[in-house]
């Protein structure tokens, strides 16, 4: 049964694992690769089972570990064109990172009253 595992949350870094012990994705990677690998291991989750990293935006508290995690473990990165461009400019990704750009991936925030509540949507036709 898929679950949500908050690994890190806050201004010092954000990262969430969604999935099971066998398969999952990361939403953001806002800490170092080592810290994220350790946080997964503490929850008995293996980085080898991470199938993708979805990056909500390019701030370092959401994207700091993307380059190392994605290149070290061959994890595909998904985000918008604007976020990918900004991450490239900030050296948060490089040519060793497998990137998919899509306008059909987004974070929906219902209203200002629910700023901490969001959902990721992915158009499966791509």
Range-by-range predicted roles:
Residues 2, 45-48, 112:
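Structured loop/turn residues at beta-strand edges in well-structured enzyme cores
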Residues 1-43, 126:
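Conserved beta-strand hairpin/beta-sheet module of binuclear metal-dependent hydrolase folds
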Residues 81-126:
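Metallo-beta-lactamase
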Residues 12, 32, 59, 83, ...:
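A generic "binding-loop/recognition-motif" signal
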Residues 3-6, 53-56, 116-121:
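Short, flexible loop segments at the rims of nucleotide/cofactor-binding pockets, characterized by
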């Amino acid at each position: 049964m898929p679950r949500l595992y908050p690994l890190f949350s806050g201004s010092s870094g954000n990262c969430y694992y969604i999935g099971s012990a066998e398969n999952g994705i990361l939403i953001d990677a806002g800490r170092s690769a080592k810290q994220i690998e350790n946080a997964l291991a503490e929850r008995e989750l293996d980085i080898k089972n991470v199938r993708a990293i979805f990056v909500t935006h390019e701030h370092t508290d959401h994207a700091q570990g993307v380059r190392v995690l994605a290149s070290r473990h061959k994890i595909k990165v998904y985000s918008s064109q604007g976020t990918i461009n900004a991450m490239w400019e900030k050296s948060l990704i490089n040519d060793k990172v497998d990137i998919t750009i899509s306008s059909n991936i987004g974070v929906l925030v219902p209203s200002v009253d629910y700023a901490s509540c969001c959902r990721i949507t992915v158009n499966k036709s791509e």
